[in-house]
Amino acid sequence: MTRYDAVEAASYRVAREISLTGLSSWRDAVAPYFRPGSTVLDLGAGTGLFVRAFAEWFPDVTVVAVEPSAAMRSASGLPMLAGHAEAIPLPDASVDVVWMSTVVHHVRDLTAAGAELRRVLRPGGVVVLRSLFRERHSGIGLFRFFPEAARALSSFPTVAEVADGLGFAVDRLEAVPQVTASSLAEKASSVRWEADTLLRSLSPDEFSAGRARLLAAAAVETGPVVDHLDLLVLITVGGV
């Protein structure tokens, strides 16, 4: 999995974290899986956005956070374990849900990760992903201002590649809206080249041109910025 340094981790908190109000559709989308008394593994927890969200949304659920980057763990200010998808530092059959938010495109060995997921999941457990997939990106407004970033999609897997690579079956797939920013002006003030996999594919000139387009639009357009990421729920093959 990709490892972030201290500068990238700090930028991530500025550029990528979304308010809990903006994420409210995700609370509703995952609620069926976050049952009282269950244990959730936030795998690739980053700076802890969803650790904090789940604590507020689902107070009767235990969340265990695992993150490979020491800088991200430090920036979170939360208790997190060092580990990654191919080596999860948890006992066998210890979690009911594995949550992975914008993580799976960083996983280098899906087969090894799938074996680890099956190991730590209890019978009947599920893997719940919040992600962008190569063939499903029309809901991402970033491409309007940074069209060259589309070339980075080649590094993102398809839904089938994720499910087949991990060795799970698709149980649910749908686009979930989220309010990424209260306005384009807010979005322009927080966008960071180093904090986004898509933007890091841009040259300095491409990034500057895209930010100029974003600022120009922000001067005349009002209203919230709404993007869509996919919810993908995976179950063990056969549903066992």
Regions found by a protein language model. Give the residues of each.
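Conserved class I S-adenosyl-L-methionine
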Residues: 1-35, 49-53, 57, 72, 126-154, ...
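Conserved Class I S-adenosyl-L-methionine
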Residues: 19, 47, 172-240
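Class I SAM-dependent methyltransferase SAM/SAH-binding core
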Residues: 41-43, 47-87
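A conserved beta-strand element that flanks and buttresses the S-adenosyl-L-methionine
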Residues: 99
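Short catalytic micro-motifs in class I SAM-dependent methyltransferases
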Residues: 102-106
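A short glycine-rich, Lys/Arg-flanked "PGG" loop and its adjoining helix->strand segment in the class I
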Residues: 111-123
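Short alpha-helix
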Residues: 153-167
